[in-house]
Amino acid sequence: MKRLNKLVLGINLLFLVISITAGCGMGKEAEIKKSFEKTLSMYPIKNLEDLYDKEGYRDDQFDKNDKGTWIVRSSMSIQPNGKDMNVKGMVLYMNRNSRTTNGYYYVDVIERQDKGIHRDNEKKYPVKMVDNKIIPTKDIKDENIKKEIENFKFFAQYGSFKDLSKYKEGDISYNPEVPSYSAKYQLTNDDYNVKQLRKRYDIPTNKAPKLLLKGTGNLKGSSVGYKDIEFTFVEKKGENIYFSDSLHLEPSEDK
């Protein structure tokens, strides 16, 4: 009888541990979603100049008279199996104090070398934004690059995350020492954002991507660290296809 009671007690304790662990996991997932939701709920921002009037997270890193600078990034990285990786993207710095924007479009070929050594061949093309139009600030002879800049749209302009709660059963990771955190979800090709990416990029795979929300810093908010979203279509040795995006507010250099 005593053995039976001990067995029942052991089983109950096991279920309790599992329940607590699952509860903590779900709680942390909700925290991660809430942390990203503050920014992603603004998507889509069709007119990027609207960001001049949008507030972001502020802490003691900001001077009291500094409205901050929004940093907008989007890039697509494609490495066919066994070949070099091609990366194309853009970064904009939108100063809310001066209401001016500058940045650059970049093209990078990361070559695979013997012994696993990589060599970058990044080229940057400075740009500015006027009346929601991105304009090169220097003469560009390559007509293809000029057209790519002219037609470029940030994911923040067409992506939509109105309801993050629809993403469920994610793979959650949290390291309080860094701190760092991430939530990964398997998507389908019917997902709205996946359709938008395929519409704009020649993605050489039919595989549906995983959505990765990853960041560092205080989950409740911090101007130190980062918050990125990534759509990972392929991730393995010698072959990678992924799209990266971020939008965050930082202290302005001009203050």
Swiss-Prot record:
This is Uncharacterized lipoprotein SAR0106. It is found in: Cell membrane. PROSITE patterns: PROKAR_LIPOPROTEIN (PS51257). Its main location: membrane. It is a lipid-anchor. It comes from Staphylococcus aureus (strain MRSA252). NCBIfam families: SA_tandem_lipo. Residues 1-23 form the signal peptide. It comes from the Bacteria. Keywords: Cell membrane, Lipoprotein, Membrane, Palmitate, Signal.
